[in-house]
């Protein structure tokens, strides 16, 4: 027993990064070994009985783990979250109760669609996920830099991602695939326009804002609740890469956003974000003019649509990142997030995309990191107690010792009270369920139309013009039948937008033909 405790103590010290007492080079089993260079000391030829060589090569072959199915490329930093305003009137979450309360956290920024080696400056959604190590468990805020998404039907997600990835025949990016999918799924048009604006090419991670997109429920002790949408706005303000600048950033330094983040933190220029919450009383939800559970629409902050109610935000906290991880693989590549990681006082809404993500994210981590991914130090909550989750690949702790693999009151286990809410607050859901809101509807054209027409006002005319130019450059690479579908689809949004895209594509075609003829 004493030997076992001693070994556990040594293992704990190693896991904590205390290596000062372990200076002798060894093989994997701890056997001291000579310097790992050159042929065997006795001059014999290399053979499989050279245990150190076999061990080194075999381990090298297994260094890589599956990359993330989405958000493959990323960077992370540690920091803290501080409550800056009293929101106890709408919130019963321990982490957010008490102005000045601080919680340690880690934030990972990422690209979305392409592989781990892709350039950070490419036109793409960007991820911003934060894990808060609270006293009541780990709470994950899994955000994108856009406040809405392409789809509201989770069955469409695999096809959406495949359409944005590489052609299975050539392994090249293929605009035909992307625009063919868009023109068959009109609920995506709101997101498409935002993606092709300069919002789609953010310059660095420090300027990125993160939006949960989904509605969650903040539940009070009496069972009442509010629908909420949380977002983190960069205190630096947005910083866009435009046109050739975005291409230059990707070509010259595909890791420029990560480099910028790490260099800023190392020189003490810590990036900060303001946490905001938008609140909707369930009784008011039917009167907003759109479905707050439809993640293809945003909660209007006053920019657009002008004819729909504004849903103001309340600032309540400050996120500061101030430390770079010591080891990328251990602390960034193995970092695992999920929208299902919540704490008391929070419940998911009925948003079908949110509910699908609550399964898909942990399942992706089980595939990528194993069934015990929650025990990896960067993911671990020190208060975790669940002896039903035991054994399996990656079990390197005491595995709950001799405790049985079930729980009951007779074991002296404490259980939290059920987190319930008053069903009368869900009355409007019965109205919602009677409407076929998964089908394409007028709001699927209204929101992108209002975004397009509002751009000159809340950004600039130049911002709108560049968005159209970016669309033209992409559509011009497609086949003629795809182009015709694009023109028709954009006509449903705004005839002027459709006409501008068509004129621009035809102009590019004419210029290309002229250049081709001049080379004859």
Swiss-Prot record:
Ergot alkaloids are known for their toxic effects on humans who consume contaminated grains or livestock that graze on grasses harboring ergot alkaloid-producing fungi. Due to their strong affinity for monoamine neurotransmitter receptors they may also have clinical uses such as treatment of migraines, Parkinson's disease and cerebrovascular insufficiency. Disruption phenotype: Accumulates the intermediate 4-dimethylallyl-L-abrine. Its EC number is 1.11.-.-. Induction: The expression of the ergot alkaloid synthesis cluster which leads to the synthesis of fumigaclavines is positively regulated by the brlA and stuA transcription factors. Its cofactor is heme. Keywords: Alkaloid metabolism, Heme, Hydrogen peroxide, Iron, Metal-binding, Oxidoreductase, Peroxidase. Pathway: Alkaloid biosynthesis; ergot alkaloid biosynthesis. One of its GO terms (molecular function) is catalase activity. Heme binds at residue 361. This is Catalase easC. It comes from Aspergillus fumigatus (strain ATCC MYA-4609 / CBS 101355 / FGSC A1100 / Af293) (Neosartorya fumigata).
């Amino acid at each position: 027993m004493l030997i076992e405790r001693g070994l556990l103590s040594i293992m704990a010290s190693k896991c904590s990064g205390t290596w000062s007492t372990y200076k002798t080079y060894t093989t994997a089993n701890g056997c001291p070994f000579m310097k790992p260079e050159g042929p065997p000391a006795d001059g014999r030829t290399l053979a499989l009985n050279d245990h150190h060589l076999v061990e080194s090569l075999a381990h090298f072959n297994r260094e890589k783990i599956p990359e993330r199915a989405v958000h493959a490329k990323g960077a992370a930093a540690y920091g803290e979250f501080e409550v800056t305003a009293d929101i106890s009137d709408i919130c019963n979450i321990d982490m957010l109760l008490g102005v000045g309360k601080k919680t340690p956290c880690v934030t990972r920024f990422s690209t979305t669609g392409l592989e781990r080696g892709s350039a950070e400056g490419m036109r793409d959604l960007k991820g911003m996920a934060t894990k808060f190590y609270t006293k009541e468990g780990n709470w994950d805020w899994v955000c994108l830099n856009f406040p809405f998404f392409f789809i509201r039907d989770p069955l469409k997600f695999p096809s959406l991602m495949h359409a944005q990835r590489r052609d299975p025949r050539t392994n090249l990016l293929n605009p035909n695939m992307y625009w063919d999918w868009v023109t068959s799924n009109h609920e995506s048009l709101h997101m498409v326009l935002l993606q092709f604006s300069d919002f789609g090419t953010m310059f660095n991670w420090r300027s990125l804002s993160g939006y949960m997109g989904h509605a969650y429920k903040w539940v009070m002790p009496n069972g009442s609740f509010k629908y909420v949408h949380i977002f983190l706005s960069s205190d630096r303000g947005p910083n866009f890469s435009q046109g050739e600048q975005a291409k230059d950033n990707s070509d010259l330094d595909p890791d420029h956003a990560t480099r910028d983040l790490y260099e800023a933190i190392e020189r003490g220029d810590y990036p900060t974000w303001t946490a905001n919450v938008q609140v909707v009383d369930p009784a008011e939800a039917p009167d907003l003019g759109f479905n707050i559970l439809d993640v293809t629409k945003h909660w209007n902050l006053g920019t657009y649509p002008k004819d729909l109610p504004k849903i103001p935000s309340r600032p309540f906290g400050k996120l500061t990142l101030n430390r770079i991880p010591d080891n990328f693989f251990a602390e960034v590549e193995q970092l695992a997030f999920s929208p299902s990681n919540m704490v008391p006082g929070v419940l998911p809404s009925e948003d079908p995309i949110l509910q699908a993500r609550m399964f898909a994210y942990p399942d992706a981590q089980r595939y990528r990191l194993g069934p015990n991914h929650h025990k990896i130090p960067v993911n671990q909550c020190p208060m975790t107690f669940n002896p039903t989750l035991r054994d399996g690949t990656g079990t390197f702790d005491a595995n709950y010792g001799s405790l049985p693999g079930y729980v009951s009151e007779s074991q002296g286990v404490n259980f939290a009270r059920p987190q319930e809410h008053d069903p009368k607050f869900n009355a409007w859901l019965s109205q919602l369920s009677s409407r076929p809101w998964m089908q394409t509807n007028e709001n699927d054209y209204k929101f992108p139309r209002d975004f397009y027409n509002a751009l000159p006002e809340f950004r600039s005319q130049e911002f709108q013009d560049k968005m159209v130019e970016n669309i033209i450059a992409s559509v011009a690479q497609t086949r003629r039948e795809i182009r015709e579908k694009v023109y028709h689809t954009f006509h449903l949004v705004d005839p002027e937008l459709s006409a501008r895209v068509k004129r621009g594509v035809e102009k590019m075609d004419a210029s290309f033909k002229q250049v081709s003829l001049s080379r004859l």
